[in-house]
Amino acid sequence: MATSAVPSDNLPTYKLVVVGDGGVGKSALTIQFFQKIFVPDYDPTIEDSYLKHTEIDNQWAILDVLDTAGQEEFSAMREQYMRTGDGFLIVYSVTDKASFEHVDRFHQLILRVKDRESFPMILVANKVDLMHLRKVTRDQGKEMATKYNIPYIETSAKDPPLNVDKTFHDLVRVIRQQVPEKNQKKKKKTKWRGDRATGTHKLQCVIL
């Protein structure tokens, strides 16, 4: 299906934040979405930022995605990026029961920082390609998502990827469904870093 030309001006920008424990595949999902490659090796991230023009439901937008640190030693940074996010992907690995149990911590922190009873989020069950290592069932994931009243999706960044584009696009759809009054609170000029770029370029990267 043909897509329309990318508009040059006045595109809405959505700040999407990917959170979760270290090693659950946050960077692999993000890199697969932006660069269409699978990175199999785990390299702890401090903070990576990406920009992309994309068309979702016949509407063009700029996705400004922050891939965050999962390591506990960087937990002090979390509130800062949570304040500026328009929506969040809470990622756990289906092979790591502890990462699933820690979802509640991220969910509660987001609501506390945002001072809201609800906020655009999606619960992401990653690494479903590793079925022989699976420790968290689909039903357990769905039950948790129902508890939080947020969507649930299962993903794999490994080629061929499963639901990677859909996950990011669905989060934008959730944000768009919010009532205008709530969205107005988030229209401040905030930045995660310095100069911006367009396209699918990674803007800043600090690797341990």
Curated annotation (Swiss-Prot):
<keyword id="KW-0449">Lipoprotein</keyword>
<dbReference type="GO" id="GO:1990830">
    <property type="term" value="P:cellular response to leukemia inhibitory factor"/>
</dbReference>
<feature type="propeptide" description="Removed in mature form">
    <location>
        <begin position="206"/>
        <end position="208"/>
    </location>
</feature>
<keyword id="KW-0547">Nucleotide-binding</keyword>
<feature type="binding site">
    <location>
        <position position="24"/>
    </location>
    <ligand>
        <name>GTP</name>
    </ligand>
</feature>
<feature type="binding site">
    <location>
        <position position="67"/>
    </location>
    <ligand>
        <name>Mg(2+)</name>
    </ligand>
</feature>
<feature type="binding site">
    <location>
        <position position="45"/>
    </location>
    <ligand>
        <name>Mg(2+)</name>
    </ligand>
</feature>
<feature type="binding site">
    <location>
        <position position="22"/>
    </location>
    <ligand>
        <name>GTP</name>
    </ligand>
</feature>
<feature type="binding site">
    <location>
        <position position="38"/>
    </location>
    <ligand>
        <name>GTP</name>
    </ligand>
</feature>
<keyword id="KW-0488">Methylation</keyword>
<keyword id="KW-0378">Hydrolase</keyword>
<comment type="subunit">
    <text>Component of the SHOC2-MRAS-PP1c (SMP) holophosphatase complex consisting of SHOC2, GTP-bound M-Ras/MRAS and the catalytic subunit of protein phosphatase 1 (either PPP1CA, PPP1CB or PPP1CC). Interacts (active GTP-bound form) with both SHOC2 and PP1c (all isoforms) to form a tertiary complex; SHOC2 and PP1c preferably bind M-Ras/MRAS, but they also bind K-Ras/KRAS, N-Ras/NRAS and H-Ras/HRAS. Interacts with RGL3. Interacts (active GTP-bound form preferentially) with RGS14.</text>
</comment>
<feature type="binding site">
    <location>
        <position position="27"/>
    </location>
    <ligand>
        <name>Mg(2+)</name>
    </ligand>
</feature>
<feature type="binding site">
    <location>
        <position position="27"/>
    </location>
    <ligand>
        <name>GTP</name>
    </ligand>
</feature>
<feature type="binding site">
    <location>
        <position position="40"/>
    </location>
    <ligand>
        <name>GTP</name>
    </ligand>
</feature>
<feature type="binding site">
    <location>
        <position position="23"/>
    </location>
    <ligand>
        <name>GTP</name>
    </ligand>
</feature>
<feature type="binding site">
    <location>
        <position position="126"/>
    </location>
    <ligand>
        <name>GTP</name>
    </ligand>
</feature>
<dbReference type="GO" id="GO:0005525">
    <property type="term" value="F:GTP binding"/>
</dbReference>
<feature type="binding site">
    <location>
        <position position="158"/>
    </location>
    <ligand>
        <name>GTP</name>
    </ligand>
</feature>
<feature type="binding site">
    <location>
        <position position="25"/>
    </location>
    <ligand>
        <name>GTP</name>
    </ligand>
</feature>
<dbReference type="GO" id="GO:0030742">
    <property type="term" value="F:GTP-dependent protein binding"/>
</dbReference>
<dbReference type="InterPro" id="IPR027417">
    <property type="entry name" value="P-loop_NTPase"/>
</dbReference>
<dbReference type="GO" id="GO:0007265">
    <property type="term" value="P:Ras protein signal transduction"/>
</dbReference>
<feature type="binding site">
    <location>
        <position position="21"/>
    </location>
    <ligand>
        <name>GTP</name>
    </ligand>
</feature>
<dbReference type="GO" id="GO:0019003">
    <property type="term" value="F:GDP binding"/>
</dbReference>
<feature type="binding site">
    <location>
        <position position="44"/>
    </location>
    <ligand>
        <name>GTP</name>
    </ligand>
</feature>
<dbReference type="Pfam" id="PF00071">
    <property type="entry name" value="Ras"/>
</dbReference>
<dbReference type="GO" id="GO:0000164">
    <property type="term" value="C:protein phosphatase type 1 complex"/>
</dbReference>
<dbReference type="InterPro" id="IPR001806">
    <property type="entry name" value="Small_GTPase"/>
</dbReference>
<feature type="binding site">
    <location>
        <position position="127"/>
    </location>
    <ligand>
        <name>GTP</name>
    </ligand>
</feature>
<protein>
    <recommendedName>
        <fullName>Ras-related protein M-Ras</fullName>
        <ecNumber>3.6.5.2</ecNumber>
    </recommendedName>
</protein>
<feature type="binding site">
    <location>
        <position position="42"/>
    </location>
    <ligand>
        <name>GTP</name>
    </ligand>
</feature>
<feature type="binding site">
    <location>
        <position position="70"/>
    </location>
    <ligand>
        <name>GTP</name>
    </ligand>
</feature>
<comment type="similarity">
    <text>Belongs to the small GTPase superfamily. Ras family.</text>
</comment>
<feature type="binding site">
    <location>
        <position position="129"/>
    </location>
    <ligand>
        <name>GTP</name>
    </ligand>
</feature>
<comment type="function">
    <text>Signal transducer in the Ras-MAPK signaling pathway that regulates cell proliferation and survival. Core component of the SHOC2-MRAS-PP1c (SMP) holophosphatase complex that regulates the MAPK pathway activation. The formation of the SMP complex only occurs when MRAS is GTP-bound. MRAS has low intrinsic GTPase activity and may require additional factors for activation. The SMP complex specifically dephosphorylates the inhibitory phosphorylation at 'Ser-259' of RAF1 kinase, 'Ser-365' of BRAF kinase and 'Ser-214' of ARAF kinase, stimulating their kinase activities.</text>
</comment>
<keyword id="KW-0342">GTP-binding</keyword>
<keyword id="KW-0636">Prenylation</keyword>
<feature type="binding site">
    <location>
        <position position="156"/>
    </location>
    <ligand>
        <name>GTP</name>
    </ligand>
</feature>
<feature type="binding site">
    <location>
        <position position="45"/>
    </location>
    <ligand>
        <name>GTP</name>
    </ligand>
</feature>
<dbReference type="InterPro" id="IPR005225">
    <property type="entry name" value="Small_GTP-bd"/>
</dbReference>
<feature type="modified residue" description="Cysteine methyl ester">
    <location>
        <position position="205"/>
    </location>
</feature>
